[in-house]
Amino acid sequence: MSGEKVVKILCNRFGFTVSGYSGSHVRLSKADKGMKVGTVVPMHDELKPGTLHGILRLAKIDPEEFFRHL
């Protein structure tokens, strides 16, 4: 799965917004129950499974819930 697709799913389905760019990485954030939640997504053609799980962990999203939106 590409970084671009992950960003689209996080923004369209989970309410994240792009808060910045740094080289080939995109910072995403959202306010969740009074807390600010954020993650960084590398814009690679193919993300490794461990990288994707790390992104979801930082975003506080259950991987099963994320994969339901594919």
Residue ranges of predicted features:
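Basic nucleic-acid-binding interfaces
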Residues: 1-21, 27-70
